[in-house]
Each structure stands twice: as structure tokens, then as C-alpha cells.
């Protein structure tokens, strides 16, 4: 999943901290020393240890070696009707919860599931930490900066825990799948009550019960992915846009990426379950869905009984009465001709392709284990543009990969000029503990990396501004998402090509699709005037 979805949909990142962007500065080795821990008991698959006065019940801990293994075990589809134990169905009556989400849309999707379970247990949502009885921090491990923010929040909650000792604080998500992170929390953040990972979200009611009725810190992090759990409660944010997960995990193992370790192997949902979910959302009046996966283009490859891929799925979904359908994130290796053919049919399949390239030099791409060359990417991009000539084409780019030369960086600049991306999300490489790239020696000074990022951003911004000028004085279809973050008197929404549009209009059109005439084209957004409502609102 790309950095655009992880960190927000607008803009690139000019400011990068030295700690975040430099060579690996994190040293978690000290957190692997448990000489000060006392083993209290070991039985029935549970180990209880005591550190600095607090007992910790360990059911499962993260293990990178286990997380990397890709076995041939059958992945079952579970449809439980008893996710919430009987004694937990009213445990939250009169209490409130807060789920803080960092990272990508997949994390937002997971947080919606957790919120759904908490609501079924009687809890009420709140945005205020001081009002919450349960706080869950759903974490992102893709960059060091994201981890630093999480540990900052964990530290800030320590005083609140002192004031409200009955408060339950849980840490979940991708960071929980990292060995060093869990060890650090055990030793340095003992006000945390439970830690669980990405594979056992459905176990939240049981883990919460242990945390509420026991005094120990609860740790249950499955290193190996589990089965696919359907029918999970979900509390979606809003009634306009919805995330629909179509698959889990990633098997690409790019050398810089932690996701295959934290999200497990690729597992596809059954197409009938996905289609039914989309139909339900259409009946509820949703205007846009985004099909989610770490690598959506690999969808269906693990379904042994079906010859069915992403193109087949989208060909069925395009017939459902929902105005807009998006998908993210793609990998160039799996973007096949059938998918291009289906996308070219248009209709509710929007004209926006986000296809992360990461670098413009074939040697660097090989070091990244992307398994394609620059030439192959260009050929694919041109094929897509020929089939969908009005499509917006965006990407992700990394600068400062270990030992990147000036010539190799120039190849990235020339690729941006050749493809003319409508926008790109650009980053200085951030080493991830446990990945092959983190072990590579790097002789590129940080000031050089920063200068390269600035040059790349200047080029991307220039092309983006030119592309946006093409919208000047044109009328575009906009899905109104809400008030502008900068001005509550201005509404904001997106075109089918994913351009941000700001305009004045009545609050009553939030959630609807309207037509807007573009009056000003800026680098990263468009300004306009509302013309009329669109017929697709029904």
C-alpha cells in the first residue's frame, strides 16, 4: 500500500526529519534483554513474566521468521455468529471508547471493524481521550516517523492512566507485529494493557475481557496469518465512501518493505462475499467504494478452485448501481491486460490509476526486488494510457535508497518527465528493521538525499500544475466529501480522476455528487463554483 494512502491523499513530503529519513537510527537491541524479567508461570500455552512490578501474560509474540514463511496451509473462510461472548455484550454500557488510527486505508478498515465490535459490546464512541474508558491505538509500521508518533502518543497516555487506573489502553496494528516494538512496550510502557496484531482483530472481545478482569498486560500477536473472518461488525465513518477489503497480505517482499511481515501471505476473499458487500453498500446509498488490498492486482491467484482475478471482479462490480469504484494499491507485476480491458469500459470505474514505480533506474529496482525494469514499467504505463486516454496517472517514488548514485537519481527524474505523472508521492527511504534493505550499507549523505527530494518535488509539482491547468474553465463531476480542512465555509470533494476541488456551496450537498466549474487551477487542487447537482444521486 502506497504512502499516499498511509499518510493522506494530498501532496508530497518536502519536510523529512533526519531520524526518519537517514540510515537506520533505531536500536531496539536493548529491548531484547530480559535478564530483569522473572518468569511467574508457564502453562496451557501462556507464559506469565514480571517486569518492574507488572505481570505480563504472553499468549503469542511476534516472530519475523514465522512472519516471512509462506506455507501451503489452507486458508478457511469463517463466518462466526458468536464473535461477541454473551458475558461481553453489555460490558460497555455507559462507557466510551476511542480508536486512534495511524496509516493506510487498510488500518481505517480494521479500525471500523474494532469500533463495530466495541459498539456491539455497548460502548459509545468518543473523540476525547479523557472521556474514554477504552483506547485502542491502531499503528502503522511503514516509516520510522509513523512509529515515533505512536510512541509519542503512548507516552502521553501515561499520565491519563495514572489518573484513571481503570482505563484500558491497547496497541494493535502493524507495529504490534514487530518484535522490537513489543519488547519495548513490555519494558518501557507498562501502562499499556494489551497488545494484539493484524491477524487476530476478531479476538478483541476476548482480549478486552482479559484486560478488564485481570491485572496483567495481555500480549497476543499471531506471527502467522489466520483464516479469513467474514461477518465482522463494522462501524463505518460516514455514509458516502466505503472501504471494501478484497484481500489480505502481500507476497512480493520488496527489500525495503515491512508489510509482508506484518500482514502475512496473500489471501483473497471469495468474490461472492465481496459482491454482496458492494451491493449492500449500494442499497445503503454509498456513492463511492474503494477496493482494498496490499496488492489488489494479486487478487484471486490463491483461489485454487477459481480462475478469477481482479479484472473479473471489477467487471462484475461495474454492473452494480454505485456511482464510483476505485481500487488500491496496485503492483506493476500483476497489472494484466484483462484488467486494463475492463477498466477501459468506464462507467462507474473511475479514470484514476495509482501505480507505484518507486524508482526510475533498473539497477535500483532490482535491489528493491520490484521484479520489473524501467522499460517494462514504461511499456505498461503506455498501454494503460492508450486504453484509457483520459485517465489520471499517479505513482510513489523513493529517493535515497542505499548507495543511489547521481546517475540513478537522474533516471528517476527522466522517468517522471517521460510518463508525466499527474502527481506523485515522494519520500526519502526509511529503513525498516527486519528487512533486507535495512542491512545494506549506505554512502549517500543525508544532505544529498534532501537535495534530491527537493529536486524531484519541484519537477513533480511543475508537471502537476501543468496538468491541472487543463481543467481551467471546465465543468467537472465532484463527490462532495465535506468541509475544507482550511476553511469551514468552503466545501471539498474529488473528481473521478482524484483531483481535489474546493468550492462554495450549501452544506446540504455533502455526500452528493455535483458539477463544479473550475475557476482556478493550482498545483495540488482546483477551485471552482458549483453549477448543479448530478443525476447519479438518485
Swiss-Prot record:
This is tRNA-2-methylthio-N(6)-dimethylallyladenosine synthase. The lineage of its organism: Bacteria, Bacillati, Bacillota, Bacilli, Bacillales. Belongs to the methylthiotransferase family. MiaB subfamily. [4Fe-4S] cluster 2 binds at residues 250, 254, 257. Catalyzes the methylthiolation of N6-(dimethylallyl)adenosine (i(6)A), leading to the formation of 2-methylthio-N6-(dimethylallyl)adenosine (ms(2)i(6)A) at position 37 in tRNAs that read codons beginning with uridine. Residues 469-532 form the TRAM domain. Residues 1-23 are annotated as: Disordered. NCBIfam families: miaB-methiolase, MiaB/RimO family radical SAM methylthiotransferase. It comes from Halalkalibacterium halodurans (strain ATCC BAA-125 / DSM 18197 / FERM 7344 / JCM 9153 / C-125) (Bacillus halodurans). Its cofactor is [4Fe-4S] cluster. Residues 95-213 form the MTTase N-terminal domain. PROSITE patterns: MTTASE_N, MTTASE_RADICAL, RADICAL_SAM, TRAM. GO terms for molecular function: 4 iron, 4 sulfur cluster binding; metal ion binding; N6-isopentenyladenosine methylthiotransferase activity. It is found in: Cytoplasm.
